[in-house]
A protein has these predicted regions:
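Bacterial N-terminal signal peptides that target proteins for export
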Residues: 4-15
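Hydrophobic core
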Residues: 16-24
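Acidic Gly/Asp/Thr-rich repetitive segments characteristic of extracellular carbohydrate-active
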Residues: 34-67
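A general structural motif
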Residues: 59-63, 84-86, 222, 276
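Extracellular beta-strand-rich solenoid/capping regions of secreted or surface-exposed proteins
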Residues: 72-88, 97-122, 130-146, 164-168, ...
């Protein structure tokens, strides 16, 4: 009898401690960190694609929260949000990256997310594909409606892609964030509205005569870009609208020297010209 009583006394503090921890730490958070990378409400998903697949197609706004970092290693890992789905992707300070790959024919080539629906990205996360030298085109390929509230988005300099690519008929709104690393930070063929952000480009035609770009490009006869504020820095050039409509209300546009070839390759900080169709600038 004494032995049993003594055991109970020893176990009592343990059970009290466990109960205290369980009360402080939500059950869903524990499971999310151990067995999944994304969460909708209390439901945990093993992949971001599984979470996107669970979102209703009737336009209901659904928050998907990342609970762990994600590393993609092959093309099948690229995530697609289908038309009709409305997602707020809370990066929750996490990251989505490409696995390191320096081969000329990488196992993974593209951007981490293809958006055909309505996607809002928030939560100050990182989307970085720069580890794949020739396959890390950038972060987001937008065919739908994309809103970026904050975060850091990086592509691979030599992959000949854009960190954010806004396709024809797509709509893009950027409130803030850092966009850099890729051949081009923002390539717009649709409608893009920029309220703030930092856009950096380091490509240089003297370093590579076939892979270089202005940092921001407005590049379609039907493209429309409304730029209210932000900082655009480029080695080859900062902002280019060679087609479509560009309205610039403020911001800083700057060219910087190539660390190898100096200022020789630099084009214009701000370039507006009708290379394709008729260009309007206001």
């Amino acid at each position: 009898m004494f032995g049993v009583y003594k055991l109970k006394r020893k176990l009592l503090p343990f059970f009290l401690s466990f109960a205290l921890i369980a009360a402080i730490v939500p059950t869903s958070a524990v499971f999310a960190s151990e067995s999944g990378v994304a969460q909708i409400g209390n439901t945990v998903y093993a992949s971001l694609q599984e979470a996107f697949d669970a979102v209703p197609e009737d336009g209901t706004s659904t928050t998907v929260t990342l609970t762990n970092n994600i590393e993609m290693s092959e093309t099948s890992d690229i995530v697609t949000l289908e038309k009709g789905k409305n997602v707020i992707l809370d990066m929750n300070g996490q990251s989505i990256t490409f696995k390191e790959d320096t081969s000329a024919s990488p196992a993974l080539a593209g951007r981490t997310i293809i958006n055909n629906g309505n996607l809002t990205i928030t939560g100050n996360g990182i989307i970085d594909t720069s580890a794949s030298t020739y396959g890390g085109y950038g972060a987001i390929d937008n065919y739908g409606t994309l809103t970026v509230e904050n975060g850091t988005y990086t592509g691979a300099k030599l992959a000949n892609g854009a960190t954010i690519k806004n396709r024809p008929n797509a709509e893009l709104t950027i409130y803030n964030g850092t966009f850099d690393g890729a051949t081009c930070s923002l390539y717009n063929e649709g409608i893009a509205t920029i309220y703030n952000g930092t856009f950096k480009g380091e490509t240089c035609s003297s370093c590579n005569s076939t892979i270089w770009s202005y940092t921001i490009r407005n590049q379609n006869v039907n493209a429309k870009m409304y730029f209210y504020d932000g900082t655009v820095i480029g080695t080859q050039g900062a902002f280019s609208s060679s087609a479509g409509l560009a309205e610039i209300y403020g911001g800083t546009f700057e060219t910087v020297a190539c660390p190898i070839h100096g200022t020789g390759p630099a084009f214009y900080a701000l370039y507006i010209a009708g290379e394709v169709g008729q260009v309007e600038a206001h």
